[in-house]
């Protein structure tokens, strides 16, 4: 019986059985499985790319937006990069089995905490076949089984990728059911996964705000929400006094907005100190040269128009919007306090301050309640690879169970280990 003919509950039962095996696997065997997956992806390049070509053709026939088709498309180079990423995960430190120093309590019992896998993950995502492999690799290395539900646009690609992964696992005598893909793209199957709380330990959605909202509103399984949120940069006056700092600000803001505008850690709103407005034209000129549409409040709009630059008048809706495109809003503030109030109302993902005042920097770090807070660095660094985690399954913007990029450690939890010699509680 293939995963194509199994019910979602069947997948859950098989995943739970596989998870019992995975949680005890030594690091070397998990790493060997990932290297086997990397080899199998390369060996099946023709099959995988042919399946992907069918998905791309169907997407183009359905007139899906160009950016969705681009996310969907694989070629030999991108598949090789995916395989390399899997091999790289195998080199990461394995958090499973880490143990806190043992304490001996007055009762004589010895107490410690040990890091263990979450168990079974359900990951729901859209038109990115690379996520299928990336998430499978992270789940396996952290000792978790995973049930994957991709978008309908990736049905053929995901089936081919799942085949490669499962064949590699079988070659290493690891349960194939550690990685399973829901083949039926119907929303009813997603609902079944969201409500499989007796078998699935956590749901991790990867996609837009609509997908996250649907999961939160319909799941009985705990949902880890992430990847959505408004990104702010506050440009303090102190960072505009030195021409070299102005050049740094222009470069950093360009990187934050232009490098990958569809990313969740791309800039959405620039907050600028009113006394820093004289440098705004230099920033705006650079952004518009790279195709960015600007929406500004009255003081910023006046500064731009006086400099002969095009911009639109911002509306209230432009603040608090995650654009995921070459659009940014600009808001003038009287100082740090107003910037902090604004971010408190609109932020929770990644927020940046550009300042030469260490007191203001520390206040910003202390007061801003976001998954990542940065001083004089691009928000694009809020990424698992960039923060030294090696890879990530998602970027969580909630406070439980994890916050920020979710690497291997964030896919684990802890259990108490108590050792005694017949002690009883008095």
Swiss-Prot record:
Alphabetical keyword list: Amino-acid biosynthesis, Cytoplasm, NADP, Oxidoreductase, Proline biosynthesis
Gene Ontology biological process terms from the UniProt entry: L-proline biosynthetic process
Pathway the protein takes part in: Amino-acid biosynthesis; L-proline biosynthesis; L-glutamate 5-semialdehyde from L-glutamate: step 2/2
Localization per Swiss-Prot or TrEMBL: Cytoplasm
SUPFAM superfamilies in the record: ALDH-like
Enzyme Commission numbers on file: 1.2.1.41
Gene3D superfamilies according to UniProt: Aldehyde Dehydrogenase, Chain A, domain 1, Aldehyde Dehydrogenase, Chain A, domain 2
Pfam families tied to this protein: Aldedh (PF00171)
GO MF term list: glutamate-5-semialdehyde dehydrogenase activity; NADP binding
NCBIfam families in the cross-refs: PRK00197.1 (NF001221), proA (TIGR00407)
UniProt name for this protein: Gamma-glutamyl phosphate reductase
């Amino acid at each position: 019986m293939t995963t194509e003919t199994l019910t979602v509950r069947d997948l859950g039962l098989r995943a739970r059985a596989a998870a019992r095996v995975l949680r005890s696997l030594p690091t070397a065997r998990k790493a060997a499985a990932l290297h086997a997956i990397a080899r199998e992806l390369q060996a099946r390049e023709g099959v995988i790319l042919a399946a992907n070509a069918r998905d791309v053709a169907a997407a183009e026939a359905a007139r899906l937006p160009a950016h969705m088709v681009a996310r969907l498309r694989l070629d030999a180079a991108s598949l090789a990069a995916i395989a390399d990423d899997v091999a790289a995960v195998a080199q990461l430190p394995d958090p499973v089995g880490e143990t806190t120093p043992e304490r001996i309590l007055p009762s004589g019992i010895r107490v410690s905490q040990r890091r263990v896998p979450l168990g079974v993950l359900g990951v729901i995502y859209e038109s990115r076949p690379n996520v299928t492999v990336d998430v499978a690799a992270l789940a396996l290395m952290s000792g978790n089984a995973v049930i994957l539900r991709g978008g309908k646009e990736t049905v053929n690609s995901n089936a081919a990728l799942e085949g490669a992964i499962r064949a590699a696992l079988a070659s290493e005598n690891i349960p194939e059911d550690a990685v399973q893909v829901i083949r039926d793209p119907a929303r009813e199957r997603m609902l079944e996964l969201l409500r499989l709380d007796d078998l699935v330990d956590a749901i991790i959605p990867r996609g837009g705000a609509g997908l996250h909202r649907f999961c939160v509103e319909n799941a009985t399984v705990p949902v880890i929400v992430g990847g959505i949120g408004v990104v702010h940069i506050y440009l303090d006056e102190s960072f505009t006094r030195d021409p070299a700092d102005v050049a740094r600000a222009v470069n950093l803001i360009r990187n934050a907005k232009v490098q990958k505008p569809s990313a969740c850690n791309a800039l959405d709103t620039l907050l600028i100190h009113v006394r820093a407005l004289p440098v705004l034209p230099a920033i705006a000129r650079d952004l518009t040269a790279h195709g960015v549409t600007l929406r500004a409040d009255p003081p910023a709009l006046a500064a731009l128009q006086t400099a002969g630059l095009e911009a639109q008048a911002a509306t209230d809706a432009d603040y608090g919007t995650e654009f995921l495109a070459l659009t940014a809003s600009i808001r003038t503030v009287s100082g740090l306090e107003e910037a902090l109030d604004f971010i408190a109302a609109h932020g929770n993902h990644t927020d940046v301050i550009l300042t030469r005042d260490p007191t203001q920097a520390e206040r910003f770090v202390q007061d801003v309640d976001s998954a990542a807070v940065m001083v004089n660095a691009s928000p694009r660094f809020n990424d698992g690879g960039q923060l030294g985690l090696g890879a990530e399954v998602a970027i969580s913007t909630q406070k439980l169970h994890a916050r920020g990029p979710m690497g291997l450690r964030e896919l684990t939890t802890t259990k108490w280990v108590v050792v005694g010699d017949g002690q009883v509680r008095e």
